[in-house]
Amino acid sequence: MELALDDDADDLQGGLTALVVTVVELLVEALEQEAVRRMESGSLSEDEIERLGRQLQALEDELERLKQQEDINAEVSEFREDLDHVIRDAIEQLSEHETPSGHGSPESQRDDV
């Protein structure tokens, strides 16, 4: 998905809205993963779990409403695909630079004494 500067204002606004919604969706997913981690560790009370679940669901519902209202489902999906590829490539590049011990290349391991 590209945000071309020569697009008309509606296209630019739709693209920007799609980008913002995509980023917020990714943040909500990260929050959900953190909530699950905290639930599994037992650090949340039942009330906190309920409240957190309602808040996350409200965020997801609002994002879905916004995507429908602005007709940006396809654009959001495209941004997510593009971001998935970027992240996958970054992980692969990091993996290529890892040593078998998993601590990076020998050049990056200096003794600063």
Swiss-Prot record:
Choose any GO biological process term that the UniProt entry carries and state it.
Answer: gas vesicle organization
Which residue intervals are annotated with compositional bias (Basic and acidic residues) in the record? 90-100
Stretches for region Disordered: 90-113
Q: Entry's Pfam families?
A: GvpK
Instruction: Provide the primary localization.
Output: other
Which InterPro entries does this UniProt record tie to the protein? GvpK
Under what conditions is it induced? Probably part of a gvpF1-gvpG1-gvpH1-gvpI1-gvpJ1-gvpK1-gvpL1-gvpM1 operon, maximally expressed in early to mid log phase. Detected at low levels in growing cells, at higher levels in stationary phase (at protein level). Not detected in isolated gas vesicles. Gas vesicles appear earlier when grown in static culture, possibly due to O(2)-limitation.
Q: Where in the cell is it found?
A: Gas vesicle
What happens in the null mutant?
A single deletion produces no gas vesicles.
Coiled coil ranges: none
GO CC annotations, alphabetized: gas vesicle
The UniProt keywords, alphabetically, are: Gas vesicle, Plasmid
Give the misc comment: Encoded in a 14-gene plasmid locus called p-vac which produces predominantly short, spindle-shaped gas vesicles during all stages of growth.
Quaternary structure per UniProt?
GvpF to GvpM interact with each other in vitro, and may form multi-subunit complex(es).
Question: Which family does the record claim for this protein?
Answer: Belongs to the gas vesicle GvpK family.
The record's function comment reads:
Proteins GvpF to GvpM might be involved in nucleating gas vesicle formation. Gas vesicles are hollow, gas filled proteinaceous nanostructures found in several microbial planktonic microorganisms. They allow positioning of halobacteria at the optimal depth for growth in the poorly aerated, shallow brine pools of their habitat.
Q: What is this protein called?
A: Gas vesicle protein K1
**Organism source for this protein?**
Halobacterium salinarum (strain ATCC 700922 / JCM 11081 / NRC-1) (Halobacterium halobium)
